[in-house]
Amino acid sequence: MLLAAMCLALLGCLQAQELKGHVSIILLGATGDLAKKYLWQGLFQLYLDEAGKGHSFSFHGAALTAPQQGQKLMDKVLESLSCPKDLVPSRCDELKGQFLQLSQYRQLKTVEDYQTLNKDIETQVQQDGLWEAGRIFYFSVPPFAYADIARNINSSCRPHPGAWLRVVFEKPFGHDHLSAQQLASELGSFFQEEEMYRVDHYLGKQAVAQILPFRDQNRKALDGLWNRHHVERVEIILKETIDAEGRASFYEEYGVIRDTLQNHLTEILTLVAMELPLNISSSAAVLQHKLWAFQALRGLQKSSAILGQYQAYSGQVRRELQKPDGFQSLTPTFAGVLVHIDNLRWEGVPFILMSGKALDERVGYVRIVFKNRAYCTQSERHWVPEQSRCLPQQIIFYIGHGELGHPAILVSRNLFKPSLPTQKWKEVQDQPGLRLFGRPLSDYYAYRPVREQDAYSTLLSHIFHCRKESFITTENLLASWVFWTPLLDSLAFEVPRPYPGGAENGQLLDFEFSGGQLTFSQQQLEVLIPDLGSVPKPSDFQVLGARYRQSPLITAWPEELISKLASDIEAAAVQAVRHFGKFHLALSGGSSPIALFQQLATGHYSFPWAHTHLWLVDERCVPLSDPDSNFQGLQAHLLQHVRVPYYNIHPMPVHLHQRLCAEEDQGAQTYASEISALVANSSFDLVLLGMGTDGHTASLFPQSPTGLDGDQLVVLTESPFRPHQRMSLSLPLINRAKKVAVLVMGRTKREITTLVSRVGHEPKKWPISGVVPLSGQLVWYMDYEAFLG
């Protein structure tokens, strides 16, 4: 029967057309929800598209279920398959009959089952006089099952040399960078990179799949517009009306950021932001350009995100996971994240990623909003959509649902008339009364697909045709997790804002962005956290003054502490410029000062940057462009946002003559000479220090005498942490400063804070204890967690 079906299927391509070989497609998890809803229909669509074009096919549905029961379940799914509306019914019946005959169920549970499958495929190909082109294994199973299945395929089910193997995986691909690395390493031990296809089904959605072709086909119109000079912002949005009921186990582990932002929305972001390769048909070029886009993403801070949770969620978790009555989940079901890209094209343009459950509508879209610099002298009633520059200018890739109800591409008529392939996209008829993004539909050139197709049908076709650009490579996957993991870690204990769900949300989740920060527009009056007692807010405490090691101590919650320190630095700067015409500020690197840099960049517009010289307290011996470089952190979070003359910026010369911190290059002496030449008496106006958990400060470390005394102003040191080589201001130079501020933040600093408060002047054991300005002032800035624990 199977042979007869194959002969019938190949009848159309036997006339003078050479056969292209046999393809076996094995769907693992063939009776699961994803397979029932999308994958079998997608495989049927693949057969409809490819029947008669030279390949022969066999489809194997596989699961752990016993053969008889599994076949029964699979047959029920196959009977419900449908053809496109434009396919003649008789042709549909014919092809569906062939597909059913070519599809069979088999149990894949043991090594022997995989060996039997391999033998059956080889026997079938030989008996039918065919040659094997390749095999596709689609893993529609939970990730914990990947390793065993991969091992069995690799050992028992690979095709003979000359035939290809393609293995397809569904997310999640880990829950952070480390777990993603581990999974990638495990799969990489069984399969080559070119054999693996990681699915993000949003890349198969028609509007998303059209982003790169649209940019390519409209290069002439977009070349001058697709950049920071013309784009005001980019919104990448996915809203759902449903909640997480029935999926509490999954959602508690992943939450909304891992579920949608880290994958779907980030992949879309790269399609919008990446540089266009010369040939978008080259998978390798597209994937490389996407990777470069990942590498240009500015690191996220806690302040880059806002979180919410619909009010019924914790109750659902308690019921589904048998949690105690008082359990309150911190898992967010809503998130907005502000992303910036540090390159010439997108510098300063906010990319807003937002997704959530239990919202007011189901809709997904990508919206590029252009700056409006026009002023129109006539009243709005005389504005003509095709001509008036005062009307909003935007391009929208409408993913689906919402008021429009279907995928679409919308371009404001006052921008340009886009070019799209007419065989795939057609103009949308106007719908009077329908308004999208503040304008009537008639204000747009609007296009929709000639034939709507689900994402999995598109992706299965791309797998078959080896179009890797629609999938996620190991390198791009890990780059995404490198970007998202620090934010996820910083938000792990953040309490999300509760919201009622649906239309009742009102303006509760509206948010605003400024600089690198997102904040809710509406202040929340009350946060209910059952059984956790009263949770203090920063506003409940004032900035407190005290003394620490005989010097002034400022303590506060982090937000108030950073604000106070920034104000004190500005006051010192204004005073120095008033008296001496310049302000010399030496800054430390690391994570603690980042919030300070951001505060200075976004909240201190009277700061005398034009008269400020910026120096580094210490630097890692890496290129200045390296993410580990202290200068790179300063550049990302401060320098690019303020107007400091470039000749007033003094990075440490750690990279000379193609070498890093080589003593013979005399980088430390060069920096010392520069300080002596520009800073009066080598006395900085203000030095900002931190304190490590081992008592180190700058890059002066315990049990190392380097830089603790003597005449050297700048020294090379060795750190116990990677990268080991450092350059640092010496303790004698630091102590010449007019003011030294030590910033100490976080619960992990509590132990060293207590210890240092009790020791005397012991810089060899605790370098921070050697910070005693000769004639200047030392002030400690500590948050409550560092000071009180």
Swiss-Prot record:
The modification N6-succinyllysine is found at residues 205, 424. Optimum pH is 6.0-8.0. Keywords: Carbohydrate metabolism, Endoplasmic reticulum, Glucose metabolism, Glycoprotein, Hydrolase, Multifunctional enzyme, NAD, NADP, Oxidoreductase, Pyrrolidone carboxylic acid, Signal. It is found in: Endoplasmic reticulum lumen. Residues 17-524 are annotated as: Hexose-6-phosphate dehydrogenase. Glycans are attached at residues 154, 279, 681. In the N-terminal section; belongs to the glucose-6-phosphate dehydrogenase family. In the C-terminal section; belongs to the glucosamine/galactosamine-6-phosphate isomerase family. 6-phosphogluconolactonase subfamily. This is GDH/6PGL endoplasmic bifunctional protein. It comes from Mus musculus. The gene is H6pd.
